[in-house]
Amino acid sequence: MGKYFSDIHASCESQFRGLPHGLADTPEIAACRAEPENYEALLSLADALCWQLRFREAIDALTRAIALAPERIEAYRKRGPKYLDTLQFGAALDDYTRCERADGVSVESRYRIGMAHYMLREYDAAAAAFSDSLALVSRDDDMCVADIYWLVLSLLRAEKNADAHAVLRQHYAPDMYVGHHTAYEKAMRVAAGFAELDEMLSELEAEPEDLQYTMAAYGLMVLLESRGKQARTEALREKILRRDGFWYCFSYLAAYTDAAQAEPD
């Protein structure tokens, strides 16, 4: 996966549960550690650690940077997403909120805050944030379909199915611009009634990329859940969790969190 992260990288369990990852420092990480500790050096160290998906160590580096210059916002911008990637959703929301106060409301700030609320299972708050983001985004921006996807899923989870379908009628079109978010569009195509769920699931079975599979399949999983198909929901979630090649994508994090919530005490 060298396009996005190192081929040698930390596992999801090491980052979700704080287990040893067994990785040696890369030359880039070692070089960053050798630098005198200052704000910029710690941000560079965090970036180098993230290339190996060593997000918990990156959080530590960014927290040390914040201690050196708590008034600066750059480390908070980097730390919030890493908290989300390690299932520390409340901490992610705190950092996202701080950044929005500093930087102003934007498509990205509302989207990130919505994502934190969704992971916390605060679906009404998530829907409000995604709705805000959707109101700001341009129709020719690929974030539009991402907002639609997560807004619809938030509303379905909040048991507001009529509102979810109203969003689809107002904002979704099969020929809308989606950029690289083709997997989100596939799930929304089914939700909007332009494709059959079982046909899309069959198509996904041939998808070679875990990222694309997970993004589309998670949306279909929530759709199945909203239709009362619990056994099929759980079976699809199991398939998603086995496709962990891009484990820090939002849809995988959501599926993993759903599974953890479903486990008996």
Task: State where each predicted segment sits.
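Canonical positions in the second alpha-helix
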Residues: 31, 64-65, 98-99, 133, ...
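Structural marker of alpha-solenoid helical repeat scaffolds
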Residues: 34, 68, 102, 136-140, ...
